[in-house]
Structures are given as structure tokens and as C-alpha cells.
Amino acid sequence: MAEQVFQNFETLQLHAGYTPDPHTRSTAVPIYATSSYTFNDSAHGARLFGLKELGNIYSRLMNPTVDVFEKRIAALEGGIAAAATSSGQAAQFLTIATLAKAGDNIVASSHLYGGTYNQLNVLFPRFGIKTKFVRSGKLEDYVAAIDDQTRAIYVESMSNPDYVVPDFEGIAKIAHEHGIPLVVDNTLGAGGYYIRPIEHGADIVVHSATKWIGGHGTTIGGVIVDSGRFNWNKHSDRFPEMVEPSPSYHGLKYWEAFGPATFITRIRVEMLRDIGACLSPFSAQQLLLGIETLGLRAERHAQNTEKLAKYFESSPNVSWVLWPGSESHPTYAQAKKYLTRGFGAMLSIGVKGDASAGSKVVDGLKLVSNLANVGDAKSLAIHPWSTTHEQLSEDERLASGVTEDMIRISVGIEHVDDIIADFEQSFQKAYGA
């Protein structure tokens, strides 16, 4: 697919970013299992290393198989380019490390995945980068948190595990008025199927590709997508590294050389070069296989999740249901506005009782797997209080939307009647009714 003529998601997931090799005519994307690439001559190698010419040098920076994956995700999300990473946490780390340095800060929603919260709250302060967490969804609280050292606003498209959908357009407006980018973790957006944050003002999108993009629980990976819309030159006071001469490349000026692709270029030629958190071609091929059925799976995931949510709402063993498609959800209006192809593939419930009751229900499941992943074709459940958010303090867990009685469920594509039956038998064992 040399030129992106077709724009529909279901077509892009199969064709974007790849044209059959002219020699082999392989219809499937080959796995280029190579560490490095030959140069035409020494002058060619010098041009590549000096970024005067773009091309393959070393697979830590770029690889033909990984390149197809990157182009495909960029097309699905509506970005100009993408960079793949070894995991979602790596994608997040490299993004923030590119935007901020010691003395800077990030403003972030407190409604975050536990691993993300820890990275922002514990790891980055070791490098001198602090995070100001906004516990409410109020726009004025985001404004109040921003200062001269703020380098980005960070939110999740649907927070994990309480599925808060932020006011993207409102937050993006605030970010841009202050000369900073909006970064959105769109992992729960399923590769752009449920929502494309860039269409609503996001400047940078990150994913754990391990989840719905891969879709089968086989492969760890991440990806960063650049919208190409943020004007780094206009805001050079906050981001001098984007416009001033780079000591890494003999005074090269990124904005002058790469324009709208400045950010994603720095991710590739500095962060992947120096940190090394790259995606292997084998992992890229597995993720590409997953992408080919992403739209089909996401549609079924959303249908099953809605039916399961309605079952839980009528269950005497469930105190509450958190699902963004429910009118009782605090951000239902925003979910209805932004999620145009279904309300996602996850929900959380509060079971009658305390933490021990939640663990008992999860332990009693037979079909639904008890594990820490989400976004698998198979249904998964976990007790976040004692697992994914266990490293947080009690106050931090509550601020993240995690309670003792919560069970987080990633709804698979099995027949929904069997998923319901599994919870029913577990409830009977746990409660005797």
C-alpha cells in the first residue's frame, strides 16, 4: 500500500504501511531478523549517521518489520509517524523523558494505571522530574497545576480501572494555551478503534501494544504516535532541545531539519539510541498479526462488555458497576461524546463485602483467567487492591479509583452467556446464592 488511498479503519488495519517486496512479492510482512544493515559505501554510512539521509542503520533505531508496524499504528491513530518500543511503560517513559528534564514537571490526572502512577510518582522524581496529580476532572484544576516548568499534560483515554473519560477538547485547549502538548495513553482505546485522541486535540498518543493491538496475550510492546501538530518552534522557550543545535548530531537543529516530525525523530534518534527500549522484529510481526483482526475483536469486545454490565447491574451480589457506557458513570456524557464505536472492553464491579470477598470471587472463576493483563481475546479478571495497585498507599489507591471490593474485568470475545455463567457459579460459591 504505497499511498494511503483508503481511510477506513478496517482497511488500514490490513494494508497500511506495507507494499509487497518487489523481489519476493510476499503478501505477508517479512520478519527482518537482523541487527544491522550494509551501507552502499562509507559516504552513504556517514550520511545516515549524520541524519542527512534517512535509512536503516541498526535495529535498535529502526527495522523494516517494525517500520510497517509503526506506519500502521500511525495510520490507525491519525498521526504522521510512530516509534515502537519494547513495552507500554517504555513508550510512556521515553515520551516524558523527551519532553522534560531535571527541574521540570508533568501535570497528570490521578486516574491512572498503577504502573503509570508509580513511574510518574516514584521513578521520575529520581531524575528530577515531578508530577502534579489532578484528582478531579475539573478544567480549572488543570489550569491551577500548570507553571513555567510544566512540560506536558498526561491523561488516559479511559482510565484503568475506573474508566474516567476526560474532556479531551477542554484539556487540549488548556495545554495549548500554555504552550505544552497533551499526551494521551490510548491503550483502552484499542489502537484508535474506540477513540482517536488526536482528532480531539491530543498531540502525542502512547499505547501498550500488548493489549488490544496485539490482542492475544502473547507479546509485550509499546508505541508512540506523533500527531505532527504541536509547534515546537513557537514554544522553544519550554522546549529548547527541539530547536537549538543538538550536541548529539554536530549542531543539527531538529525543527529546522524535520519540522512537524521533530518530536518523533528525537524519540528515535536519541531515546531509542540511548535508552535502547526498542521492539524486536519478531514482536512486531506478532503485533501486526493482531492488528489485522483488531476491528472485529474490538466490536465483539464492546458488545460483550455491554451485556455483561447489564447482567451485573441486576445481580444481588454486586454493589455497583463501573462501565463508561452506563448513565450512572461520572463521565458518561464525555464517553458518549468521544467514544463513537462502543464503550470499550472493560468494566469493574464492586462485590458485596470487603477485599477478601473480591479475592474469593476472582479465585472461584473457571473460564475467566485471574491475571494482570488486559486486552486479551480471552476474558480476564483481577482484584486491583491487592495486585496491580498494591504498591500504592491506601490514599493513592482510592485517588486512582481503586477500592477494596473492586474486581476489574477485561471482557473477551467468548460467547457472552458463558462469561456470565462463570461469574454466576463463582458468586454461588462465594455467597451461597
From Swiss-Prot:
* One of the record's GO cellular component terms: cytoplasm
Give the record's biotechnology entry: Fusaric acid is phytotoxic to plants such as cotton and banana. It has been shown to induce programmed cell death in plants. In addition to a mild toxicity to animals, fusaric acid exhibits acanthamoebicidal, antioomycete, and antimycobacterial activities.
Glycoprotein as a keyword?
no
**Pathway the protein contributes to:** Mycotoxin biosynthesis
The organism's place on the tree of life at top rank: Eukaryota
* Coiled-coil segments on the chain, per record: none
Q: So what EC number does this one have?
A: 2.5.1.-
For activity, the cofactor(s) needed are: pyridoxal 5'-phosphate
One GO term of the biological process aspect = cysteine biosynthetic process from serine
Q: Which residues carry this modification: N6-(pyridoxal phosphate)lysine?
A: 211
> TM segments?
none
Listed InterPro entries: Cys/Met-Metab_PyrdxlP-dep_enz (IPR000277), Cys_met_metab_PP (IPR054542), OAc-hSer/O-AcSer_sulfhydrylase (IPR006235), PyrdxlP-dep_Trfase (IPR015424), PyrdxlP-dep_Trfase_major (IPR015421), PyrdxlP-dep_Trfase_small (IPR015422)
Keywords for this entry?
Pyridoxal phosphate, Transferase
Q: Which family does it belong to?
A: Belongs to the trans-sulfuration enzymes family.
Q: What does this protein do?
A: Sulfhydrylase; part of the gene cluster that mediates the biosynthesis of fusaric acid, a mycotoxin with low to moderate toxicity to animals and humans, but with high phytotoxic properties. L-aspartate is suggested as fusaric acid amino acid precursor that is activated and further processed to O-acetyl-L-homoserine by cluster enzymes aspartate kinase FUB3 and homoserine O-acetyltransferase FUB5, as well as enzymes of the primary metabolism.
The record's annotation in PANTHER family points to: HOMOCYSTEINE/CYSTEINE SYNTHASE, HOMOCYSTEINE_CYSTEINE SYNTHASE
- Kindly provide the name given to this protein in its UniProt entry: Sulfhydrylase FUB7
Species for this entry:
Gibberella moniliformis (strain M3125 / FGSC 7600)
What is this protein's gene name? FUB7
